[in-house]
Amino acid sequence: MGEKKNEGDNKKKGGDNKKKNETPSITVVLKVDMHCEGCASRIVKCVRSFQGVETVKSESATGKLTVTGALDPVKLREKLEEKTKKKVDLVSPQPKKEKEKENKNKNDEDKKKSEEKKKPDNNDKKPKETPVTTAVLKLNFHCQGCIGKIQKTVTKTKGVNGLTMDKEKNLLTVKGTMDVKKLVEILSEKLKRAVEIVPPKKEKDKENGNENGEKKKGGGGDGGGKEKTGNKGGGEGVNMMEYMAAQPAYGYGYYPGGPYGYPIQAHAPQIFSDENPNACVVM
């Protein structure tokens, strides 16, 4: 009887030790850049190869990767970064050390703020607040991965408050106190494509209005010049008819020649002839 009791106690102890050694399954949420379905399938295969992984779900649109199983989330993140050579963010659960660091940083920031408030301001002048601007950018959206990359780069830039995307027109509207030129440079470097700043409609309307005004002013000046030239002639200038005077023509005129004739044989005049009895006599 004593031996049977000892065997039962040993079995219970062994079962308790197994339960203690087994780590409970947890849900780990990671954030990775997944450009397309091919990238997502590769990352899922890589995660499934790790020990303790039970299920893996990927969302390529948001770059979210959900993993369940008995595993260490920090080690999983580090190994995934090594294999994929991409930045992997651990959304949940956060390790205790990182939480403690965040709490310390928050406390330090609060202390600094309180000290700054206590210090007297040497300059009473307040710094000028940068105005909130709205910039419209034009660039090509190739696929869902490109859209996610654009959203990530824009949200990381300093001073951006919000953004909206128009996929049909390929327009990106950004609101905030950021430097638009720097934002354009960052996007063109990371995406390796042309990014244009679309000017607002008001500026275009003003430019068109100025051009029309200049044309009207120029036409009025010409009309004024014509009126001045007409007034110099007085009242006669109004009723004066304009005509083109014909230039004098110089030509070489020849009289028409007579018809061609033949010599006619006629008798010589008999007025002073001696043979004519009726002729005149010169004394």
Curated annotation (Swiss-Prot):
Propeptide cleavage-removed residue intervals: 281-283
Effect of C36G: Loss of zinc binding; in association with C-39; C-143 and C-146
Subcellular location: Nucleus; Nucleus, Nucleolus; Cytoplasm
Induction data: Induced by infection with the bacterial pathogen P.syringae pv. tomato DC3000. Repressed in response to drought and abscisic acid (ABA).
Binding site for Zn(2+) 2: C143, C146
Single Gene Ontology BP annotation: negative regulation of flower development
A GO molecular-function descriptor: zinc ion binding
Skewed-composition ranges (Basic and acidic residues): 1-22, 82-129, 198-230
Lipid attachment points (S-farnesyl cysteine): C280
Binding-site residues for Zn(2+) 1, renumbered to this chain: C36, C39
Residue positions where Cysteine methyl ester is found in the record: C280
InterPro entries reported for this sequence: HIPP01/3/5/6 (IPR044594), HMA_dom (IPR006121), HMA_dom_sf (IPR036163)
Domain HMA: 25-88, 132-195
Entry function: Heavy-metal-binding protein. Binds high amounts of zinc. May act as an upstream regulator of the salicylate-dependent pathogen response. Involved in abiotic stress responses, and seed and flower development.
Family membership: Belongs to the HIPP family.
Additional facts recorded: Plants over-expressing HIPP3 show delayed growth of inflorescence.
Protein name, as recorded: Heavy metal-associated isoprenylated plant protein 3
Species name: Arabidopsis thaliana
Underlying gene: HIPP03
